[in-house]
Amino acid sequence: WIHTAKSLGAKYAVLVAKHCSGFSLWPTTAHEYSIKNSPYKNGKGDIVAEFVASCRKYGIKPGIYASTTANGFLHVDNPGLVKKGSPVTQEEYNKIVETQLTELWSNYGKLFEIWFDGGVLSQQNGGADILTLIQRLQPNSIAFQGPYGYPNLIRWVGNEEGNSPYPCWATADATTSADGVQKIKGLYGNPHGNYWCPG
């Protein structure tokens, strides 16, 4: 796939390492719902490692998508809050998030882009300490809908068709850049904003 992406002129690629179901494409130590308990390579596979190796082989910058706001396996729903009936507490889920992000951001080298998709639950609102982790482990990566206060954010433009509103300013203010998520009124950015946060 990366060879094909390269032949099409791609400069970077993003792998969905963990979507909202909670299944992890790497052998995470955080829980058992991962590739290590699948028949792929007799439980010894690591698709994230294979993806990153292929990116490096073909000169493509690797990125990783890992949803933290939803996890069907652990009964966690957007914006990252544990639901009634979950096998884990909020504190335990936050530890799982921090463990998994540490694994992804420590074990596979420099990442060009990190996708959160759906934003992140801030620590002030009961979420994991994602800002400290990303600043320590991947300080140069750009982050789609990343934590408030991270300087390299890119933001949602309000739809999944790729059509941005007009005008769409590449700067934003504290209100329109929070968690990288744009409320409907903030989809345009802010021409006088202090934050570089393109959509």
What are these regions (language model features)?
Residues 1-199:
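Mature catalytic domains of secreted/periplasmic carbohydrate-active enzymes
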